[in-house]
Amino acid sequence: LDGTTLNNNSELTQETIDTLHAVKNLGHEVAIVTGRPYRNSKQYYDQLNLGGPIANFNGALCHIPGMPEWDGKYHITLDSEFVLDLVAFNKTLPVDYLMVEGTELVYSDMEELPECPYYPKDQKPIVIGKNTKLQEQPTAVALFSDIEKQPEIKSKILDRYDNDIEIR
């Protein structure tokens, strides 16, 4: 969505809508792929009304809303123990804040998230700590810091987890 389908104001233009519908009318299946969670892309999916699959969380969740029986549906989650260990380890890193997301819930080490179009506006995060009982399997973890601190953070995380994770 971002940087392609949506304009600089995070809106769909009529030209984009018409183009995607023209492609569908030629017999092609149109899929939406985004790094956003579904809750932050649902409005665009509904507005486009194409009926095809949507992949969220950079491909960790793929589904067709309203079709739970779709054979192509999948959801790759993270191990809860790993996530809670990373939450505890995060306290030793030069990170401004951390977010853990599931399909429905948002956890953070902050009570209030900064203003951002990618965060739910109508949902406060659940404050997370080492002993938090996660109410759903997490799909994504994001650590936020100044760009100059990111190489150090990445190195320390990869050292701790034996390069078993991918950092983007």
Regions found by a protein language model. Give the residues of each.
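Short, flexible active-site loop motifs that bind/organize anionic cofactors or intermediates
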Residues: N7, A31, K73, A140-L143
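Asp-based phosphoryl-transfer active-site loop
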Residues: L1-S10, I32
